Curated annotation (Swiss-Prot):
Gene field: bdbB
Transmembrane stretches, start-end: 7-26, 41-60, 67-84, 111-135
Annotated protein name in UniProt: Disulfide bond formation protein B
Disulfide-bonded cysteines: C36-C39, C95-C102
Organism encoding this protein: Bacillus phage SPbeta
GO CC term (a single one): host cell membrane
Length: 148
């Protein structure tokens, strides 16, 4: 794996997380969807990822990918849990009375693609690509300043 390959995957991860963040903001700020508690938790784990990746790109430090993989793994679990709640229309132990219901489906494409599923896919891609970078980079160097 060469340094250009690493930089390309870093950029891919950055754009994935950046567009995920922008999509989240679009639905809440432009479309005026009120995020539920689980949506907020997903945002907590998604929003720092593009910032961490940008700093990693600028400092040419691959170690930032560890934080990205950690954040995306937790975000993936929350997003998948949220999707299951929407599929089964069950109550969440996290959602409070008087707040937006976590089972409420705001957007649905093709009969099954909801916002938590889109979030799950985004987190899964970030997690998978990040994990691949970690595994492959061990062969290139000791995870320090991998690319120029």
């Amino acid at each position: 794996m060469n340094t250009r390959y690493v930089k390309s995957f870093f950029l891919l991860l950055f754009f994935l997380s950046f567009f995920g963040t922008m999509a989240s903001l679009f639905y809440s700020e432009i479309m005026h969807f009120k995020p539920c508690v689980l949506c907020w938790y997903q945002r907590i784990f998604l929003y720092p990822i593009p910032i961490i990746l940008l700093i990693g790109l600028l400092k040419k430090d691959l170690n930032s990918i560890f934080y990205v993989v950690f954040l995306s793994s937790i975000g993936l679990i929350i997003a998948f849990y949220h999707y299951i709640i929407q599929l089964t229309q069950s109550k969440s132990v996290v959602c409070e009375i008087g707040t937006n219901s976590c089972a409420k489906i705001e957007v649905e494409y093709l009969g099954f693609i909801t916002l938590p599923l889109m979030s799950s896919v985004c987190f899964a891609l970030i997690f998978g690509i990040g994990l691949k970078l970690i595994i492959k980079s061990k062969k290139l160097k000791q995870n320090q300043h991998v690319y120029n």
